[in-house]
Amino acid sequence: MQVKNPILGLCQKAKFALSAAKVEQCPDDQGYEVAFAGRSNAGKSSALNTLTHASLARTSKTPGRTQLLNFFSLDDERRLVDLPGYGYAKVPIPLKQHWQKHLEAYLGSRECLRGVILMMDVRHPMTDFDKMMLDWAKASSMPMHILLTKADKLTHGAGKNTLLKVQSEIRKGWGDGVTIQLFSAPKRLGVEDAYRVLADWMELEDKPVI
């Protein structure tokens, strides 16, 4: 008998639910939501697609194409949310301001939001956007888990060094409430660790599978 993380089966059944340009268009505020956030080109869409074994989130060579809150249903009461990519230079300033306004409204109002997965490019961590998200998580006591993405772009030693460095910086500035790991979509590095976080936040217990 082995123990299988039930979030794996749910993620494999993930399907697109709806897109929302503003909070009023979001699904009913009930159940469990986990939001995926990240600066443009941090590998957010690739991470989502890897965790769901599907091409749910749009990937593009032009970062910042995700302009809406995109909801993906795992079951009747659990959802993943792809938040707008933020910070790409080619996006007009008024559009950036629009994104930020509705991103802040979503983060500040959703009672069903159980945690935020924040993507950081392991080669360029702790941007101003990342720190803004960490500040918000601390102020609102929202659980946050960081994926240091694109870990395959660094050697094992360099990736570990970056992980330890970012862990230390976060601990000093934001306390012990933030967890962090290395992640690579192409290599599927760190996928099981990410699943465990999702299962915990969505209150799914490991179940024995015969």
Swiss-Prot record:
Mg(2+) binds at S45, T66. GO terms for molecular function: GTP binding; metal ion binding. This is Probable GTP-binding protein EngB. One of its GO terms (cellular component) is cytosol. GO terms for biological process: division septum assembly. Necessary for normal cell division and for the maintenance of normal septation. It comes from Pseudomonas putida (strain ATCC 700007 / DSM 6899 / JCM 31910 / BCRC 17059 / LMG 24140 / F1). Keywords: Cell cycle, Cell division, GTP-binding, Magnesium, Metal-binding, Nucleotide-binding, Septation. It comes from the Bacteria. PANTHER family: ENGB-TYPE G DOMAIN-CONTAINING PROTEIN, MSS1/TRME-RELATED GTP-BINDING PROTEIN. The keyword Cell cycle applies. The keyword Lipid metabolism does not apply. Its cofactor is Mg(2+). SUPFAM superfamilies: P-loop containing nucleoside triphosphate hydrolases. The gene is engB. It holds the Pfam family MMR_HSR1. Residues 30-204 form the EngB-type G domain. Belongs to the TRAFAC class TrmE-Era-EngA-EngB-Septin-like GTPase superfamily. EngB GTPase family. GTP binds at residues 38-45, 64-68, 82-85, 149-152, 182-185. PROSITE patterns: G_ENGB (PS51706). Gene3D superfamilies: P-loop containing nucleotide triphosphate hydrolases.
